[in-house]
C-alpha cells in the first residue's frame, strides 16, 4: 500500500503502545512517589513542629506554674502555722505535706525549663539571673517550712512578709520576661508550622493539578492514538460485516493500532476482489445455466412430438397389417405370386420393425438426455443458490471465513457433477447419431424391399382386381409411415442441434466453475474446515498488499 497516508500522521501515531503505556504508567508512579514523599515530608515536618510547639507550651506552663506552686506552698505553710495554734495537728501535717509537694512541683517545672532542647544566647543570659532568683526563692522558703513544721505561726508570718515577698517579686519580674520569650517562641513555632502546613497544602494542590493535567494529556493522547483509531477500526469491521466494501483507505501509523488498521484495509481489498470474482463467476454461471434450461425445455418438447409421431407410425402400421391380411384373403388364386409378395412384404415388415426398434432406441436415448438435462438444470439451480450463499458468507467471514470454505467446497462438487453430466450428454448424443445413421440405412433397405414388393404386386395387378381398393389403402398407410419417419428425422436433427448447444453451455459452465474454484482457493483454512485439505491448510490467513 501507499505509505504516504502514514507519513502525514503525527509522531505519536508511530510510537509503539508498549513503550507509550510504560512511560505513562512510569510517569504516574513517579508522580505518585513524589506526591507520597512530599506528603510524608510535610506530615513529618508538621508533627515535628507540633511537638516543638507543644514542648514550648509545656516549658512555658511549667515555668509559669513554678511561681504559682511556690505561692500555693506559702499559703499552705501559713495555714499549717494557723492549724498548729489551734492544735489541729492533722491539718498542719496535711498543709505541710502539700507545701512540700508544691515546692517539688515548682522545682520540676523549673528543671523542665532548664532542660529545654533549644536555647538562644538571650535565653542563656536570662537563665543565669532567673536561676539565681529561683534558687534564692527556694532557699528563702526553707526557714518558712521549718517554722511551719515547728508550729511557729508568728515566725512564718514575719518571714513571709519580710523575706519571701521580696524574693517572690524579684523572681516574678524575671519570670515574666522568660515566659514572654517562651510565648514568643511558641507563637513563632506555631506560625512556622502553619506556614509549612500551608506550603504542604500548596504542594499537594500543585501535585493534584499536575496529576490532573497529566491525566488530561494522557486521555487526549490515548484518545487520539488508541481510542479513535480503534473506533474507526470497529466501524470498518461493522461495515465489512454488513457487506459494505466501499470504504476508502485511512492513514495508519506504525504502531500496533496502525498495523491493525492496515491489515483491516488489506483484508477489505482482498475480500472485495474475491467477492467481485465470485459474483462475476456466479452471474456467468447463472446465464449459462439459464441457456441450458431453455434449450433443455425445447428439447423436451420436441422429444414429446417425436414420441407422438412414433405412436402415429405404430397405428398406421397396424392398419396396414389389417389391409394386407384382407388382400391376402382375396388373392388365393394368385398364391404363388402372392406368396412371393408375402415374402417380400415380410422382409419389408422386418425392416420396418428394425426401423421401429431403432427409433425406440432413439426415444430411449432422448429420454435419458431429458433426465440428464434435468439433473444439469437442478445442479445449475443449486449452483446459483450456493454462489449467492458464498457471497453472503464472504461478507460475514471476517478473518476466519469458515462457512465460506464450505460453500466453496459445495460449488466445486456441483461443478464436477455438471462436468460429468455434460460428458454423459456427449456420449448419448454420439449414440443418438449412430442410431440415426443405422435407422437411415434400414429405411433405405426398407425402401428397396418395398420397391420389390411394388414390382411384384404390379405383375399380378390383373389378378388382384378385387384388392385394388385394399392396395390403395395400403399405399396411403405406407405414405403416412414415410411422412412420420421423415418428421422424426427432422425432429431428431433439431434435437442434435439443441444437444450441441447444451454441450457448449456445459463447457462454459465448467470454465466458470473452474474460475470460481480458483477464486475460492485464495482462502487457506484449517484442516477441519473443509472435507478436502486445500493448499496451505493450517497456515494463518495472509493478506495481499493492495
From Swiss-Prot:
Q: Residues bearing Glutamate methyl ester (Gln)? A: 312, 319
Question: What topology does it adopt in the membrane?
Answer: Multi-pass membrane protein
In terms of superkingdom, the source organism counts as Bacteria
Domain (Methyl-accepting transducer): residue spans on this chain: 281-510
Gene Ontology CC entries for this record:
methyl accepting chemotaxis protein complex; plasma membrane
Q: Which residues cross the membrane?
A: 24-44, 202-222
Q: Which UniProt keywords apply?
A: Cell inner membrane, Cell membrane, Chemotaxis, Membrane, Methylation, Transducer, Transmembrane, Transmembrane helix
Q: One GO BP annotation here?
A: chemotaxis
- Ranges per topology, Periplasmic: 45-201
Q: Where in the cell is it found?
A: Cell inner membrane
Its family remark reads: Belongs to the methyl-accepting chemotaxis (MCP) protein family.
State its role.
Answer: Mediates taxis to the sugars ribose and galactose via an interaction with the periplasmic ribose- or galactose-binding proteins. Chemotactic-signal transducers respond to changes in the concentration of attractants and repellents in the environment, transduce a signal from the outside to the inside of the cell, and facilitate sensory adaptation through the variation of the level of methylation. Attractants increase the level of methylation while repellents decrease the level of methylation, the methyl groups are added by the methyltransferase CheR and removed by the methylesterase CheB.
The name this protein goes by in its record: Methyl-accepting chemotaxis protein III
The scientific name of the source species is Escherichia coli (strain K12)
Amino acid at each position: 500500500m501507499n505509505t504516504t497516508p502514514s507519513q502525514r500522521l503525527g509522531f505519536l501515531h508511530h510510537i509503539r503502545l508498549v513503550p507509550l503505556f510504560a512511560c505513562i504508567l512510569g510517569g504516574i508512579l513517579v508522580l505518585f512517589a513524589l506526591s507520597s514523599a512530599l506528603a510524608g515530608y510535610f506530615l513529618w515536618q508538621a508533627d515535628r513542629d507540633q511537638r516543638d510547639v507543644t514542648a514550648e507550651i509545656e516549658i512555658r506552663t511549667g515555668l509559669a506554674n513554678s511561681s504559682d506552686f511556690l505561692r500555693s506552698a506559702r499559703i499552705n505553710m501559713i495555714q499549717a502555722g494557723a492549724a498548729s495554734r489551734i492544735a489541729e495537728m492533722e491539718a498542719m501535717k496535711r498543709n505541710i505535706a502539700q507545701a512540700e509537694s508544691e515546692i517539688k512541683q515548682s522545682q520540676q517545672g523549673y528543671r523542665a525549663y532548664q532542660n529545654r532542647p533549644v536555647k538562644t544566647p538571650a535565653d542563656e543570659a536570662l537563665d543565669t539571673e532567673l536561676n539565681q532568683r529561683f534558687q534564692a526563692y527556694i532557699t528563702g522558703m526553707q526557714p518558712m517550712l521549718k517554722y511551719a513544721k515547728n508550729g511557729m505561726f508568728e515566725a512564718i508570718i514575719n518571714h513571709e512578709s519580710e523575706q519571701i515577698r521580696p524574693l517572690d517579686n524579684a523572681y516574678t519580674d524575671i519570670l515574666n520576661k522568660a515566659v514572654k520569650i517562651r510565648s514568643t517562641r511558641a507563637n513563632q513555632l506555631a506560625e512556622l508550622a502553619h506556614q509549612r502546613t500551608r506550603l504542604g497544602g500548596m504542594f499537594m494542590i500543585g501535585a493534584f493539578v499536575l496529576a490532573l493535567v497529566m491525566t488530561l494529556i494522557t486521555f487526549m493522547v490515548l484518545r487520539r492514538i488508541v481510542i479513535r483509531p480503534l473506533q474507526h477500526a470497529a466501524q470498518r469491521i461493522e461495515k465489512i460485516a454488513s457487506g459494505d466494501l466501499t470504504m476508502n483507505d485511512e492513514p495508519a501509523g506504525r504502531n500496533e493500532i496502525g498495523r491493525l488498521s492496515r491489515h483491516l484495509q488489506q483484508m477489505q481489498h482482498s475480500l472485495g476482489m474475491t467477492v467481485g470474482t465470485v459474483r462475476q463467476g456466479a452471474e456467468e454461471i447463472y446465464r449459462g445455466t439459464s441457456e441450458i434450461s431453455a434449450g433443455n425445455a425445447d428439447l423436451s418438447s420436441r422429444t414429446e412430438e417425436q414420441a407422438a409421431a412414433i405412436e402415429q407410425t405404430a397405428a398406421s402400421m397396424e392398419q396396414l397389417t389389417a389391409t394386407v391380411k384382407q388382400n391376402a384373403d382375396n388373392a388365393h388364386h394368385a398364391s404363388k405370386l402372392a406368396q412371393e409378395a408375402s415374402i417380400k412384404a415380410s422382409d419389408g415388415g422386418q425392416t420396418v420393425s428394425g426401423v421401429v426398434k431403432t427409433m425406440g432406441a432413439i426415444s430411449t436415448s432422448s429420454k435419458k438426455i431429458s433426465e440428464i438435462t434435468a439433473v444439469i438444470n437442478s445442479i445449475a439451480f443449486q449452483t446459483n443458490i450456493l454462489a449467492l450463499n458464498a457471497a453472503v458468507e464472504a461478507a460475514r467471514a471476517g478473518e476466519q471465513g469458515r462457512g465460506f470454505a464450505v460453500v466453496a467446497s459445495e460449488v466445486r462438487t456441483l461443478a464436477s457433477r455438471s462436468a460429468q453430466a455434460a460428458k454423459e450428454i456427449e456420449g448419448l448424443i454420439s449414440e443418438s447419431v449412430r442410431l440415426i445413421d443405422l435407422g437411415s440405412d434400414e429405411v433405405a433397405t426398407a425402401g428397396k424391399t418395398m420397391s420389390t414388393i411394388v414390382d411384384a404386386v404390379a405383375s399380378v395387378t390383373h389378378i388382384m382386381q378385387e384388392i385394388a381398393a385394399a392396395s390403395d389403402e395400403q399405399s396411403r398407410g405406407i405414405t403416412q409411415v414415410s411422412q412420420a419417419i421423415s418428421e422424426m428425422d427432422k425432429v431428431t436433427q433439431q434435437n442434435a442441434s439443441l444437444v450441441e448447444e447444451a454441450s457448449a453451455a456445459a463447457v462454459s459452465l465448467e470454465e466458470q466453475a473452474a474460475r470460481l474454484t480458483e477464486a475460492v482457493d485464495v482462502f487457506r483454512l484449517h484442516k477441519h474446515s473443509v472435507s478436502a485439505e486445500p493448499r496451505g491448510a493450517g497456515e494463518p490467513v495472509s493478506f495481499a498488499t493492495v
